[in-house]
Amino acid sequence: SAPDSAIERVRAASHCCAWSIALEAFGRSRGRGAPIGYATRTRRRVAGLEIWGAGMAQKMKAAVVHEFGKPLVIEEVAVPEVPPGQVLVKVVASGVCHTDLHAAEGDWPVKPALPFIPGHEGVGHVARVGAGVKFLKEGDRVGVPWLHTTCGHCEHCMGGWETLCDSQQMTGYTVNGGYADYVLADPAYVGRLPDALEFAPAAPLLCAGVTVYKGLKVLDCKPGDWVAVSGVGGLGHMAVQYAKAMGFHVIAVDVADDKLALAKTLGAELTLNAATQDVVAEVQRHIRGAHGVLVTAVSRAAFTQALGMLHKRGTMSLVGIPPGSFELPIFDVVLNAKTVRGSIVGTRLDLLEALQFGAEGKVASHYSTDKIENINTIFDAMRAGKIDGRVVLQM
């Protein structure tokens, strides 16, 4: 089938990258990457691309967080010196994620060390290769995702759940990220971009794309099953497309009619407005419950609603992180054998597969482009909930 072909193609190149986040790991992995200032190099040309060779010092533009809750400062800092085992990536485009806003606000339990450069959806080409790097070369097209590196030898890393590693380092949080002209990366954790995928469309796949794709995978649904996507925003509109490409019948749930109309054009067969309809009753009436529900909405009410939408033996996957907690009706869960799962971004293999769906035209983010100089205005719009889809910075 088409979904199988996409996955099999990427598994043939499974040394490429992905990443993820566990909030619990924030307190255990606070090592920093290189500081903001570095020694730098002169430019030369390879295959029509500007890269860096040995020579005089150079500067790069970056958006820097100096104080939590204050505007980012657009300034010139030194281009990083490349240590052994790492690569320097020339950033062409960088997606803006709500996690970047949380990092800049410092409103998560463990905060980044100041100052730092946010951004974990940077895409570009390898500008310089550190000593000992064997499988990447200058000019290679890559993405630098959230998961900067892990220990590689704990039970989670060895068991295919590297996103749960207690020693993980995170791009744009514990190490400097992609809101800059250049960013350092671990070559084992970058995502190799398929040739058919342009830079700007690839950027949102590094976080939003792989997050919803992994969330759908852990539902353990099969082609032909009914899957509901709760929340059709920056993540949800991509989830509808991934679900359709994976062979599922898709239900879209939101509180905004315009987002539901978009979901319909993206392949949703049933759309429901949670503000005006009894979503649980409608899903049970139409299909006797969904086999899986992916919750991207940052809403505790959506979590409870998702459980009610499930078919017997159904699974709900949670990727949204609203504050607080939600009640779990034990009687319903036990008697109907329902499963509740959290899902944390995705592994390197998950990212590889997510990018391939994009390369084959099965998934495309709805995004607008902007300049790094406008990052504070973008964050203001994000706080106000005025951003549709995603924003990609053109560097």
Regions found by a protein language model. Give the residues of each.
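C-terminal hydrophobic helical "lid"/dimerization subdomain
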Residues: 52, 57-58, 257, 304-308, ...
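Glycine-rich beta-strand-centered segment in the early N-terminal region that forms part
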Residues: 80-94, 107-155, 189, 194-200
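Cysteine-centered motifs
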Residues: 16-17
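Short, Lys/Arg-enriched N-terminal segments with co-localized hydrophobic residues
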Residues: 35-55
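Mid-domain Rossmann-like dinucleotide-binding core that forms the NAD(H)/NADP(H) cofactor-binding site
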Residues: 142, 195-282
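Glycine-rich cofactor phosphate-binding loops and adjacent beta1-alpha1 units
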Residues: 219, 251, 255-257, 261-339
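NAD(P)H dinucleotide-binding glycine-rich loop of Rossmann-like/cofactor-binding domains
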Residues: 111, 149-230, 265
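Short N-terminal strand-loop motif that marks the start
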Residues: 50-123, 185, 394
